[in-house]
Amino acid sequence: MNPISQFVREYLLAVQFFTRIPVVGRLADWVGYSPELLRASAGHFPGVGILVGVMAALVYGLIQALLPNTPFTPLVAAVLSTAATVLLTGGFHEDGLADVADGLGGSQDRERALEIMKDSRVGAFGAMALMLALLGKTALLAMLGSVDVSPAELGDDASFSSWYIGAALLTGHVVSRGLPLLLIWLLPHVGNTASSKSKPLADQISQGSLLVAFIWSFVVLALAGLALDAISLIVACSFSLLALLWMGALFKRRLQGFTGDCLGATQQVCEIAFYLGLAVSL
């Protein structure tokens, strides 16, 4: 199979695995499935973030355009935009965050924590983590959507502000899906490899997949630079990187490695950290 066809197959499998977008019929037959193919598709996680980010940006912009301009409009747009991303992904990453919070919050013992993380029920720590994550995300997005970020020469340009929040959402979803791949590179997989949702990712991620993820992220960051200034991007990416390092250190200390839930939790934390970095740099 030629490289372009292989690239498309890997990307579509990543879309099928990490979103609710249907890949069915002849297309699904063409894409196929194997643990090796899914493992190779890891490099396309940031590419999946493009789809999620575009959906989030479209919903945010549509709500702002339809509703009257009030102080609460950005908040409504942020809530519905976040809800749209949860529907698109099936809450895949949010589920990981809840499981990690329940496991690490429910027991100091490594084995017991891993056992709790396998329980599909949401406990008190998981519920609190989900609530704080969703509140934090929507609050930051509402703030970013309500601040005038237009350059002085443009004045109060509503269209520029729309491009700004759209670029923020797109970049946040892409960067936050690229960084967790470094956990696969740096830490061993400690989940139940036989049944874990991250089974195909249990082996070390290849340098080729990391390169693909870097290319996806670099292209989006370059395009985002048309709406976000360089300083804001650097600060936001730095916040996400610090969040990744903190999560990685936590997993290494408490679990001696990572699970699929850890990857989802890290995506959520890195995304929130990205928006926080943008807010700080305003």
From Swiss-Prot:
Query: What's the stated role of this polypeptide?
Result: Joins adenosylcobinamide-GDP and alpha-ribazole to generate adenosylcobalamin (Ado-cobalamin). Also synthesizes adenosylcobalamin 5'-phosphate from adenosylcobinamide-GDP and alpha-ribazole 5'-phosphate.
Obligatory cofactor(s) = Mg(2+)
Q: How does it sit in the membrane?
A: Multi-pass membrane protein
- What does the UniProt entry say about where the protein is found? Cell inner membrane
Which Pfam families does the entry mention?
A: CobS
Report the pathway entry. Answer: Cofactor biosynthesis; adenosylcobalamin biosynthesis; adenosylcobalamin from cob(II)yrinate a,c-diamide: step 7/7
Q: If you read the UniProt record, what top EC class would you report for this enzyme, in one word?
A: transferase
Query: What GO cellular component entries does it have?
Result: plasma membrane
Write the protein's name: Adenosylcobinamide-GDP ribazoletransferase
